Amino acid sequence: QNGWIDFRYFGDMSIAMGAGVGGGSLIYANVSIEAKPEAFAQGWPEAIDYTTLKPHYDTTGVMLNVQELPGNQWTPRTHLMKEGADAVGAGDRFHVVPQAITFDPDWNTQRDDPYSYGHSKTWVNPQGKTQGTCVHCGNCDLGCPVQAKNTLDLNYLAAAENAGADVRPLHHVRTIRAV
């Protein structure tokens, strides 16, 4: 009844929404890509453009600890995609996507049982929450067992609680007011 995914069906379309504290950040693949400036050329109010949003992209990137997968942790598929891009002359356009995941630059597949949760290094984030580093177990969409995924409950909501906010699961917010 009160799971962390809420499924909604709308005729020809169904959606999955995050239903726990942290919302949609609990069930996404952590991809954090900035829209390119040209994306705002049509269909957006004039006041909303890349220049206006850039400081917010930067702030969010810091809060979510956005980073790229270290080169020593690329999968064979990632290497093949890079080789393919190079082969067709588009190597300069190939990039791994920025993700809201904390990677350990020393993690590698050569160690015994590399995907073991025991290889995750714990650390305390700026909001005082204990997290781990990614061990590439592949459970990003389902919930990271080592808390390397930087979900909103570990950063923005934790910062709000640290500032005195009261986070109440299973409640609907109707208004927000200063006290």
Regions found by a protein language model. Give the residues of each.
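Conserved beta-strand-loop-beta-strand element in the redox core of flavoprotein oxidoreductases
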Residues: 175-179
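Conserved redox-cofactor binding core of oxidoreductases
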Residues: 50-173
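Redox-cofactor-proximal catalytic regions of oxidoreductases
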Residues: 1-72
